[in-house]
């Protein structure tokens, strides 16, 4: 595996491989890689002759600068993991390489980007679209891989691809969990042992809510989850919403649509964790 730091060098390598008819998969990451990322990389390696993994902590998507400072940066360990997964290139640019001048582009995909994360992290998805569109333009991949843990982000990127007419396939990949059910996240590394124990309640509650939902209404299921999370000292619920998996708009009853997802964000101490669960999938 080769580590590349500039767009120019990456494009020089890729143009040769594309000329040979090789398919290129892109896995955009912010580093601090774990088994969830590894599953995306392995899927790309399986489906494309060439896999590029970007490792870049994107400053424009952090609405909380403190979160940006604290975000773990572990490039050496990341490269070892990527090599083991069979990636062809790790693309690790500097901020100056990706943003030679400030990116003033404004992306608006309402109502997808105005609810949930969009409401609580203003500017976040604009930053995501800035960097992902730059990566798509630099790499011009045939496929790009994103985890379903960031469910709203995946929906917004699909819409961005549609509106900007990028010629590529977006591949959504299932959430990867620890054996005990906790959704893998780079932020889990910041949890104390006690916080880690509390955080388990998030996925446990979501799984229980799926059984509960089979015999209860949407509003009863919302209350079931809210009550279970708020009962745990050390957890603070930011939001839990039950939405149409395509439009991300709230649903009032289970029969409203064939694709229903529950999306949750919880502060565990000062670490913000997200998760989701599918109640109905067509």
From Swiss-Prot:
SUPFAM superfamilies found in the cross-reference section: Nucleotidylyl transferase (SSF52374)
Pathway the protein contributes to: Cofactor biosynthesis; (R)-pantothenate biosynthesis; (R)-pantothenate from (R)-pantoate and beta-alanine: step 1/1
Entries under Pfam families matching the protein: Pantoate_ligase
List of catalytic residues: 37
Enzyme Commission numbers on file: 6.3.2.1
Function field: Catalyzes the condensation of pantoate with beta-alanine in an ATP-dependent reaction via a pantoyl-adenylate intermediate.
Protein name: Pantothenate synthetase
Gene that encodes it: panC
């Amino acid at each position: 595996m080769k580590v590349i730091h500039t767009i120019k060098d990456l494009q020089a390598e890729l143009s040769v491989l594309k000329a040979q008819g090789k398919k290129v998969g892109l896995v955009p990451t912010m580093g601090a890689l774990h088994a969830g990322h590894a599953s995306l990389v392995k899927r790309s390696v399986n489906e494309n002759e060439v896999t590029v993994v970007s490792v870049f902590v994107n400053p424009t998507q952090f609405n909380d600068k403190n979160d940006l400072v604290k975000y773990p940066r572990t490039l050496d360990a990341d490269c070892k993991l990527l090599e083991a997964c069979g990636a062809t290139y790790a693309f690790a640019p500097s901020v100056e390489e990706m943003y030679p001048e400030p990116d003033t582009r404004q992306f608006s995909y309402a109502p997808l980007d105005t609810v949930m994360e969009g409401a609580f992290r203003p500017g976040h998805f604009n930053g995501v679209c800035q960097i992902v569109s730059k990566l798509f333009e630099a790499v011009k991949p045939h496929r790009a891989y994103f985890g379903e843990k960031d469910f709203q982000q995946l929906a917004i990127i699909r819409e961005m691809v549609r509106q900007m007419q990028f010629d590529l396939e977006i591949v959504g990949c299932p959430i990867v969990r620890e054996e005990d059910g906790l959704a893998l996240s780079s932020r889990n590394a910041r949890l104390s042992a006690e916080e880690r124990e509390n955080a388990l309640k998030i996925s446990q509650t979501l799984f229980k809510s799926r059984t509960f939902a089979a015999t209860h209404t949407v509003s009863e299921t919302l209350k079931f989850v809210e009550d279970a999370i708020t009962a745990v000292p050390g957890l603070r619920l930011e939001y839990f919403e039950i939405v149409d998996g395509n439009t991300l708009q709230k649903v009032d009853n289970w029969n409203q649509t064939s694709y229903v997802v529950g999306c949750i964000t919880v502060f565990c101490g000062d670490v913000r964790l997200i998760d989701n669960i599918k109640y109905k999938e067509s």
